[in-house]
């Protein structure tokens, strides 16, 4: 999980940030991104791909990340921004915002996926994209954990005002119960109007 970071540290980059996002495929809520700079040469086995961890393991890993990170930042793009930009551009913008919020700032960023280069994100840092990076890079995995836990908590808070959509369980993702609630109650301001919210 540190091969990418070790190569960059050897090249003289001390503050290597991992970037990842959560919530691209959701019908409701923001897309949330995180940037995390971990200390050089420190490997933490609890930090793994967030999708491979239970909720409890993610929360424990988040606490470890918050204790150990040199810097961490979380950012989001709202449903309105998603509708205005499209989900891909909003996800990339959220990652750019997260990296911009790191203090101290990164001197290199590892970005999950392969869209950063393809979409010419306007960012000041040297970078490398890593497909399935949350399973290959500790820094990206740490960012995936922060983004996922932050977004899940936000959607559970929103559930209190809109329990009919079951966001406490589905956290905005497209489930049959979510589609059924949309048919019965319509969309909220938290839904992404550019997404297909209704289906037969």
Curated annotation (Swiss-Prot):
Cofactor note: Manganese or magnesium. Binds 1 divalent metal ion per monomer in the absence of substrate. May bind a second metal ion after substrate binding.
Gene Ontology BP terms: DNA replication, removal of RNA primer; mismatch repair
UniProt-listed Enzyme Commission number(s): 3.1.26.4
Keywords: Cytoplasm, Endonuclease, Hydrolase, Manganese, Metal-binding, Nuclease
Record-annotated RNase H type-2 domain positions: 14-200
One GO location term (cellular component): cytoplasm
Positions of a divalent metal cation binding: 20-21, 112
Pfam families documented for this protein: RNase_HII
Cofactor(s) annotated in UniProt: Mn(2+); Mg(2+)
SUPFAM superfamilies tied to this protein: Ribonuclease H-like
Superkingdom of source: Bacteria
UniProt record similarity statement: Belongs to the RNase HII family.
The protein's name in its UniProt record: Ribonuclease HII
């Amino acid at each position: 999980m540190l091969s990418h970071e070790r190569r960059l540290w050897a090249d003289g980059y001390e503050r290597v940030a991992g970037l990842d996002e959560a919530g691209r495929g959701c019908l409701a809520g923001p897309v949330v991104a995180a940037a995390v700079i971990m200390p050089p040469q420190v490997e933490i086995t609890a930090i793994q791909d967030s999708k491979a961890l239970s909720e409890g393991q993610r929360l424990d890993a988040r606490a470890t990340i918050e204790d150990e990170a040199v810097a961490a930042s979380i950012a989001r793009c709202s449903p309105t921004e998603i509708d205005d930009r499209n989900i891909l551009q909003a996800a990339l913008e959220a990652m750019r915002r997260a990296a911009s919020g790191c203090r101290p700032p990164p001197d290199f960023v590892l970005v999950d996926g392969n869209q950063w280069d393809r979409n010419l994100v306007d960012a000041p840092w040297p970078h490398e994209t890593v497909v399935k990076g949350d399973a290959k890079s500790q820094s990206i995995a740490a960012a995936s954990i922060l983004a996922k836990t932050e977004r899940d908590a936000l959607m559970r808070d929103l559930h209190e005002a809109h329990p009919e959509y079951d966001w406490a369980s589905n956290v905005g993702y497209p489930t049959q119960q979510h589609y059924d609630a949309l048919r019965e109650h319509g969309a909220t301001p938290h839904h992404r109007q550019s997404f297909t919210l209704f289906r037969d």
